[in-house]
Design a protein with these regions (language model features):
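Signature of dsDNA virion morphogenesis modules
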Residues: 1-247
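Terminal short linear interaction segments
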Residues: 251-276
């Protein structure tokens, strides 16, 4: 028997029965998907190599944590079939990134004050190879990137997670804008959906999941609600790219003062030498 997320209370004997139900209820399914905010789930968690440019060899004690930390993280990637059955395609985030100067960076999609990492994350879209993201797939993806400064006073717990390199997955909280159904079916009544499948199947990185499912939702535009650090996400190709500490203002002041003192000592030494 076949069970799918679109019909949680139904079972299907064959894929043909499933595909028929998807087509018959497509309008309702699209409306339902558009009516809710999509978040991570724990179904598609996979191993991702730790590719952060600032990996740590051992855990950092709480007393040694910096007061702030800059991180660069991947919130979502296109051309990757996630456990919701969605294939986000290139261009999906362009309008939302253009329309918003900053975004919410949250802890596990919890929208309360205690779980805000920052409300000032800067979003961008970068073309990256899968190998840059720690995966062996060929080709490229458009990565939704957040660059955030984490303040220890605001969320010390997540600062510690990032500082130690423990955050390996992220997830986008989003609202669907445009999506279409694609089905790998040779039935005549599925012709429209098969054409869409044939068009987008070549760009799917994880084709093994597409082959297993036999259908997918092609999402061409979505609105970013927030981006979250998660333990397990529906798209596992979402690592932390960088985590680095910025010098504190008082550190810079101390360095400047030490430099001045050194120069003064040099001048005094010159004066003493000139006396002889």
């Amino acid at each position: 028997m076949i069970q799918v997320i679109e019909f949680p209370d139904r079972e299907f004997e064959t894929k043909a029965d499933l595909f028929k139900a998807l087509v018959e209820h497509k309008k309702e399914l699209v409306s339902l998907k558009k009516s809710v905010t999509k978040n991570a789930d724990a179904v598609a968690y996979g191993y991702i190599e730790n590719i952060s440019k600032n990996n740590v060899d051992k855990a950092i004690a709480s007393a040694d944590l910096p007061d702030s930390l800059n991180v660069k993280v991947v919130i979502n990637t296109t051309n990757f079939l996630d456990s919701h059955g969605d294939l986000h395609i290139n261009g999906i985030w362009n309008k939302s990134v253009s329309d918003n100067k900053t975004f919410l960076h949250l802890q596990e999609h919890n929208r309360d004050f205690g779980h805000v990492i920052t409300d000032n994350a800067k979003g961008s879209v970068e073309v990256m190879t899968w190998k840059q993201l720690g995966l062996s797939y060929e080709g490229t993806t458009e990565a939704l990137i957040f660059e955030s400064t984490i303040d220890k006073l605001r969320n010390g717990f997540m600062l510690k997670q990032y500082a130690n390199g423990w955050v390996k997955n992220h997830s986008v909280g989003m609202r669907y804008v445009n999506l279409e159904l694609a089905i790998n079916s040779e039935a005549e009544y599925d012709k429209e959906y098969k054409e869409r499948w044939d068009k987008y199947y070549p760009i799917v990185a994880n084709k093994e999941l597409a082959d297993e499912r036999g259908y997918m939702w092609i999402v061409s535009e979505a609105k970013i609600v927030e981006g979250s650090a998660v333990v397990m996400g529906s798209n596992s190709a979402t690592p932390t790219l960088e985590n680095k500490q910025e010098p504190l203002d008082n550190t810079l002041d101390n360095e400047a003062e030490q430099s001045l003192q050194t120069e003064q000592q040099k001048e005094k030494l010159k004066e003493l030498l000139n006396k002889f």
